[in-house]
Amino acid sequence: GPAIDVLCQAIEMIQPDAYVDLGDVGEWGAFSAWKWKRKTKPPLEFIVPELEQDVEDVNKGMDIIDEALDKAKCPERHFCEGNHDNWLNMFVDAHPYLKQYRFDKAVKLADRGYTYHPMGKRLKMGKLYFYHGNQYGGQYHAANHIRKLGCNIMYGHWHDLQQHSATHVDGPKSAWSIGCLKDMAEESNTWLQNRAINWAHAFAVVDFYNNGLFTVHVVQIINGRTSLWGELIDGN
């Protein structure tokens, strides 16, 4: 969609030294336990074609971003596994003979050149940590992350934009929730049952300086458009 197109144009413009995907690279509806909550689950052979379609679709989406990273010659790539991604691992736990659906295998992370950070594991760059974001929630989840982790942390999961700062004896720290890039159309999110949401399309540009210090520039995308470094990026 347009938000992903904006991200790809930004990657080519920024020429980043590293790229971090914060996870939930797909909705993974076919693997969801919720899918069979109100109906009888059919035999496995009837489910597999849908699983295959999900894997194919998500890989195509990742190919689009990887193409931009390749063009920008981005040498370092990280993937922080999300809770939706982890549904694939849970499926393999239930069906151990279908190991090809384990998340990192299904999306070929190693072949794509990504370092894989399993769900809940944090990636550290300079004085900033990254992970999916599902461990601490609530209305003020950025404040909750700072309170529980006590470090600079950047995450996704909650789909909205928040920043909260705190100071400790060793200096100030912040938590950033940097939105999402998912399809926010009503028909793609029927599970919300028409609930109003505060989700936002966004990504972040992080610059690192000496001694692990860094600055964060959160770039919000509105209706498939944003402005970065004085340039309009239109993904429509």
What residue spans do the PLM features occupy?
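A generic local structural motif
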Residues: 5-7, 64, 116-122, 138-143
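Conserved beta-sheet core of the metallophosphoesterase superfamily
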Residues: 125-219
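Short C-terminal domain-edge/linker segments immediately following a structured domain
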Residues: 18-25, 50-54, 108-113, 157-166, ...
